Amino acid sequence: MDAFSASLMADKREIIFAPTVYKFQTFAQMAEEFKLGERDVVLTNEFIYTPFMKELGLKCNFVFQEKFGAGEPSEAMIQTMYDAIPYDSYDRVIAVGGGAIMDLCKLLGCKRPDTVHNLYFKRFPVQHEKDVIAIPTTCGTGSECTNISVAIVKDEKDGVLTGGETKLGLVSDDIIPNKVCLIPDLLKTLPYKPFACSAIDALVHATESFLSPHRKTMTSELFSEKAMDMILKGFKLIDEKGKDARFEYLDEFVTASFYAGIAFLKAGCGPVHGMSFPLGGTYHVPHGESNYMLFGAIMDYYDAHNPDGEIMKFKELVARILGCEVKNAIPEMNALLQRILPLRPLRDCGFTEADFKIFPQSVETNQQRLMTNAYYPFDLESEEAIYRKCY
């Protein structure tokens, strides 16, 4: 185990609840409460700005994330953002968007590094300097309340660039936003597939936190359980009434995502994230979908190897919500998720035969923070078997 993973396990805090949390009906109410003005930089997307902010006539500096490039944050995107938003041009950062915008705005609140690469490989210190207000517009990332900023970076081994890319999480309590504002109204513009991927992502966060063998606490478990309960009930509603039923449940979905974020801030995520990161880094599969691709297979792996541990409590919880027998809880959950969003096999995103060896090596090299938090241990062979099962 690496020293950083060991330090996470040694953390004796019962729960980490750093941001002050608000809930508003509209963005206009939030803007009035916080007196947004010309020294505020608002990082968002144009498709969010136009229906919710444009008509307010605010004097903020509105910046659209898409001008820096498509997809999830990368070294190049972050550097382009730094160049476009001079450090002395703002006093406060407002993040209005999904996980990518949350991750980017956490960096805007910190001292600028010498290089983005050095920042993510822990060769430049993280130092919080400016307030960040996080406003999620998806219901999955939970990033609005966590101490992690994820980016696709140039991969290296023993300090030497390999020529490939991977995803790394920058972890520091200094990047936790100062305030969080939950505004369910902002989720109305989210198309169905990104909605489903993000909600499944939140379920993964809650599940991995619940099954965390070393870092879970009684308090984090409360947030995990409530998040799983709300998300699965929401999925049942959609399954019964159709896709548009989600609009009746947006408050619950955005709140459940936040609860899951609180849970994994303390208890941590695990191999679903660890094994999905190279998938996102190499083939640019969106984070929630890449987690979903591996989630069911990893849960089956846990149940096969240690069915009577904490996963039994998980199955009992799922069985109660879904109204099935405990022994059928994981298959029934996987079937429900398939009805919410059909599962793509890895081959559909470009996964190759060579990746069955390359990906486990990358996971073992770069993702120990996540793999050491496994409910049941993995090795290179078991990781390869998971990828093959999902292929």
Over which residues does each language-model region extend?
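Glycine-rich phosphate/pyrophosphate-binding beta-alpha loops
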Residues: G140, F258-N291, Q368-L370
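A glycine/threonine-rich phosphate-anchoring loop and its flanking beta-alpha core
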Residues: P113-K216, G309, K313
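ATP/NTP phosphate-donor binding region
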Residues: M1-R92, L346
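Gly/Pro-rich interdomain helix-loop hinge
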Residues: T282-F356
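Short, amphipathic C-terminal "tail helix"
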Residues: D355-Y391
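C-terminal and late-domain segments of enzyme folds
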Residues: Y192-Y259, A263
